[in-house]
């Protein structure tokens, strides 16, 4: 797993809390949630949960996918799997020799 390399590549500034759960989630293989401060309203950290059982993608690809959502949050790109997501998915696939960070028809807009 190249978690720190992915974070550095994306230029993430906020901490990433990665949780791996060894059970299946019927809705998604992974999920991203931004955590904001109650006092200041500013982004505090990124919460990523990987539900790692019988997945269609490998662990590195799932983590890269969710980290792109973290990048979107830090850079205020309010889209789910739009233009910016696809651009960074392609960049990460090329840089780290990953496949299917974004899957058309699976990753919904």
Where are these regions (language model features)?
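Active-site-proximal or metal-binding-adjacent scaffold patches in catalytic folds
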Residues: 1-61, 70-109
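Walker B catalytic acidic pair
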Residues: 66
């Amino acid at each position: 797993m190249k978690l720190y390399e992915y974070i550095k590549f994306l230029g993430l500034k906020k901490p990433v809390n990665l949780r791996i759960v060894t059970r299946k989630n019927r809705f998604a293989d992974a999920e991203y949630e931004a955590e904001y401060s109650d006092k200041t309203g500013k982004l505090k950290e990124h919460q990523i949960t990987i539900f790692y059982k019988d997945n269609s993608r490998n662990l590195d690809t799932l983590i890269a996918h969710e980290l792109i959502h973290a990048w979107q949050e830090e850079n205020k790109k309010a889209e789910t799997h739009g233009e910016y997501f696809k651009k960074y998915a392609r960049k990460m696939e090329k840089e780290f020799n990953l496949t299917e960070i974004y899957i058309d028809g699976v990753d919904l807009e």
